[in-house]
Amino acid sequence: MSFIHDDFLLDTQQAKVLYHEYAKNMPIIDYHCHLPPEQVGQNKQFRNLYEVWLAGDHYKWRAMRSNGVDERYCTGNASDWEKFEKWCETVPYTLRNPLYHWTHLELRKPFGITDRLLDSRSAKRTWDECNELLATPEFSARGLMTQANVKLVCTTDDPIHDLAHHKTVAADKSFKTAMLPTWRPDRAMMVEDAESYNKYLDRLAITADININTFDDLIKALQIRHDYFHENGCRLSDHGLETVYAADYTDSEIKAIFLKIRAHKQLDAVEIEKFQSAMMVEFALQDHAKGWVQQFHIGAIRNNNPRLFRTLGPDTGFDSIGDHNYAKPLAKFLGRLDDQNKLAKTILYNLNPRDNEMIGTMIGNFQDGSAAGKIQFGSGWWFLDQMEGMTRQIEALSQLGLLSRFVGMLTDSRSFLSYSRHEYFRRILCGIFGRDMVKGLVPDDTHMVGKMIQDISFNNAKNYFPFVVPE
């Protein structure tokens, strides 16, 4: 039997039935990812397995560095084959890391490789077989999405993005997967460095075709772009936060703080926190007015290696889990919005697993009966996007909320091969329920439980998000 087989992770008969008869064939809504829109718009044909699988993958780079692989083979100038070969040499050392499971799931689907484990001995054969498939239309960017039964993806986009590739995809009626933008306005509140912030404001001003001299101008410029995103199908925002900002402030303070930084003067720590607190509220009010869903990814500390950040830049594998205490500011932020009846549907993702129960109870404070699961505890994110992390999130939500209303999995990935993460999640979910059924913790009723599995896999997301999912 191959390592990744039909019943992988399904250790009870009930789990096998739940997965094969209920979960496996459900379509995918990938409502948060980092796919490059231009690759979908241009229907990119990948030249080789490195380009589709390793390029830009900081998960793999971290593992390779930990295995003693020189940076030349991660982000450097080695050839594509050399980089792939070094990855294959590393794979056997990733046992018990989710990379080992992901790697072999991704070789199984879509490449159909189940007869080998990836290592230095199987590298060349795997390289040649996959590259041959990648030259075919079925393995283009869009072809891979179609193979994975992806109905809709939401990319992650800055307010200054022109969304040209989203328009291209929307206009092509032959492609049955929708690609929608997600509003990610983080840079509009990154006021720690006055010079870089002003450069961003200048670009935003050009894009919005408005002068940005005052705080009101900034909000108007963002509203112009928010409207533009809405016109092009955007129905979600996303915000990457080291912690939650909920300081007290007055309108006059924020206007004065903005004038100070627009004059290229550095803000102090108190001013930064007040401004970021105000921007979080402004973002949330714009989203509520449009009926969008807002997402908050909370708790990453980024670019922790100064030397390699200077050399390689962001998103290259030098981020980690933070340890901020943000329960009170989060409650204060959500309460500010709820007090005005302007709290949009919200998904909260924590990066530190110690916060699972805090988030699991926090969401219950702001459920108001207007929508099932209005406030969501998001799936295990980033470093928690693995078997233990996803299981702990599922367990916390089960005990403290309604798992039955959970909107389920997302890839959070830059790769077109990452849709196997939905399969991984579904297998884990079915395994949990199968064991519960055997133990008598839930009824041994596969139809009842199977419907819930299908809801978490697809139906809940389809019903929760305010976009139209293609049939």
Curated annotation (Swiss-Prot):
**One MF term in GO for this entry?**
glucuronate isomerase activity
Group of enzyme by EC: isomerase
Task: Write down the EC number.
Answer: 5.3.1.12
Which UniProt key words apply to this protein?
Isomerase
Its annotated pathway reads: Carbohydrate metabolism; pentose and glucuronate interconversion
Is Isomerase one of the keywords? yes
- Cystine crosslinks: none
* One GO term of the biological process aspect: D-galacturonate catabolic process
Q: Which PANTHER family match?
A: URONATE ISOMERASE (PTHR30068:SF4)
What is the protein named? Uronate isomerase
Which species is listed as the source? Cellvibrio japonicus (strain Ueda107) (Pseudomonas fluorescens subsp. cellulosa)
- The gene that this protein is the product of is uxaC
